[in-house]
Design a protein with these regions (language model features):
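Short beta-strand->loop
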Residues: 31-41, 111-119, 124-139
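A ligand-binding cleft/hinge motif common to bilobed small-molecule-binding domains
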Residues: 19-28, 98-127
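A late-sequence structural motif
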Residues: 52, 116, 127-171
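Secondary-structure junction motif
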Residues: 21, 28, 50-52, 57, ...
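Short loop/turn segments at beta->alpha junctions
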Residues: 2, 56, 96-97, 115
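Central regulatory/effector-binding core of bacterial HTH transcription factors
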Residues: 1-26, 95
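Short acidic active-site motifs
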Residues: 5-6, 31, 99-100
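Hydrophobic residues within well-ordered alpha-helices
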Residues: 8-11, 60, 103-107, 142
Length: 172
């Protein structure tokens, strides 16, 4: 989840738009628009041991994991869900984004936990599985700095992103 500190790139104008999962608090410096609902899935490389057989919470927790987290975080919501079952996973790598997590999982025995729809194309050729424990659904949002609200080109771009996400969801 993106924290208040993550609005720096938008505020500085280094980026115009960002998509991602946001927490319950967002900076007043960031405008958001819901793009779609999503759910977390586990992802491993083809041929990984988890690609065979039933995936229990115990098997999932026993693997080596890559965590997507922002600064100063070394656990995520998955760790809370596992702890409720008396389980703990081993996080061997922490990265700042889902693309990096999937790249690591594709070339190793690491397990990535990522949003299903948000990473659909990035997971091609990998083995994806439903998580063996209850995780709340999440919302993927579009974010931008308020100074861009009235910019016609930026409004057009935001509209294109919203339309593309809606079309992709309606197709499957």
């Amino acid at each position: 989840q993106k924290s208040d500190r993550e609005s720096v790139l938008l505020r500085e104008g280094s980026i115009d738009l960002e998509t991602g999962v946001i927490g319950s608090f967002t900076s007043p410096e960031v405008r958001t628009r819901r793009l779609f609902g999503d759910r977390f899935v586990g992802v491993v490389r083809s041929g990984h041991a988890l690609a065979q057989g039933e995936i229990s919470a115990e098997r999932y927790a026993a693997g080596q994991h890559v965590l997507v987290a922002r600064r100063d975080q070394d656990t995520g919501p998955m760790d809370d869900a596992l702890a409720a079952l008396g389980l703990q996973r081993t996080i061997t790598s922490i990265v700042g984004g889902f693309t990096a997590a999937l790249a690591l999982a594709a070339g190793s025995d690491l397990i990535a936990t990522v949003p299903e729809r948000h990473t659909g194309n990035l997971r091609a050729g990998m083995f994806s599985f439903a998580l063996p424990l209850g995780m709340p659904d999440l919302t993927v949002s579009l974010m931008w700095h308020p100074r861009m609200d009235a910019d016609p080109a930026h409004r057009w771009l935001r509209g294109c992103v919203v339309d593309a996400c809606a079309a992709r969801i309606n197709v499957g």
